Each structure stands twice: as structure tokens, then as C-alpha cells.
């Protein structure tokens, strides 16, 4: 069970996920979006998302991203589908399909998400950022010879990196090399706050620690791009 919200009258929205052992979906596997009405002392099913995923996988998906906004609209990912469920109107809509593990990046409070529009990182030239409170969307694109990927969020400011397509590669063990040539930091409205690039240098990896973005730099040596330090 996962608590979503409780108002001052004691009404509660919550999730039940895994094997369902009662109600009209008894015997099925999935996620129930439920409402408890304090006045009538009744539990009502708002929506049901059926899945063959095991409990641990559902838990992992919900812990990675699930968000209830101030208008009682709930967002979650299940089997690569981004669901938008209006708890008051009892309507479920799929906003995006085919998401893979790293396709979606969320801010710390999960109120803002960024989606890489191509499943294949080698082809991705567009990122869509969505403010889940206002519903506003911002799109960031790059040229045909470039690729972009999400880096993360500093508070509610979004960071993404741009790389030359010819330098993006995947090793035999599955590790993706994405040497970034330019970092973009934008606000919730898509306005550029800061950009970082240095001639002849690449950003090999990044890590966000609190309000600090740490970058490991690299340069081309003997035909290969290699790490040189921070």
C-alpha cells in the first residue's frame, strides 16, 4: 500500500499493488488507485492498471516515479507507459508509451519530468520537459549531427547534455559512452540559465550532489576520448 494524499476531512487516496485479493479485480495482478471516504467509511476503486509484472518490479517503478499533483491528478509509469489518472473524474490516459529505464528523469520532488523521445540514445535529438502541476511542456532539440540526453535536475532547473553523434558509442559490456560537448541548464519555463562548454574538452560523466553539478572531463588522446579528471 502507498499513501498518496489525505485531506483535512480524513479522505484518503492510496495505491494497492501486487496480487489483488478482494473486490472486482480479485485474483488479478496490478495497481489499484483507491479512495477512502471518511464520511461513509467506504473504500472505492478509482482506477485499475493490470500488469504481469511481479510485485518487486511494480514497487521499483512506483518508487522511481509516481506523483500526485495539487489538482488530484496522479502520474506513474507501468511497463513503459506513462499514465495520467484524474482521481476526481476517474479517467486514465496514457501520455507516453515505450519508455525504457533511462528515458524518464524526474526532479527531486517529482513534479517535473523530462522524457527522451527516442528509446535509442544513439538517435535521440529531442527531450520533452513537463511541469506536472501546470501541464506546461517545453521541448529541447539539437541538430542532425548531434545527440542529447538528460543529466538531471538541480532543484527545479533541468540539465541536459549535447554530444557529437559520431562520438556516442556502446561498449561490448553495454556501457554507453556519451562524451558531452555542451551542458545546458534551463528553468521550468525552458529559459536558459547557464551553458558550459570548453574547446577541445568533453564531459565524460556527471553527478549531482545537492546544489552542485560535478563533472568529470576528458579530451581526445591518440584518436580516443579519455577521462582526464574533474
Question: For each of these PLM feature ranges, what is it?
Answer:
Residues 2-5, 52-66, 98-108, 145-156, ...:
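Repeated scaffold domains used in trafficking and secretory/extracellular systems
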Residues 6-9, 26-27, 99:
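Short, surface-exposed loop/turn motifs at beta-strand boundaries within globular domains
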Residues 14-25, 34, 64-81, 106-121, ...:
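Beta-strand C-termini and the immediately following turn/loop, strongest in propeller blades
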Residues 97, 160-163, 181-183, 206-208:
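Short, surface-exposed linear patches
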Residues 3-18:
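Beta-strand-rich domains and repeat architectures in extracellular enzymes and scaffolds
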Residues 15, 31-33, 204-206:
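Generic structural motif
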Residues 1, 24-56, 76-96, 121-143, ...:
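Surface-exposed loop/turn elements that mediate protein-protein interactions on large endomembrane-trafficking
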Residues 100-158, 163, 168:
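Long amphipathic alpha-helical scaffold regions
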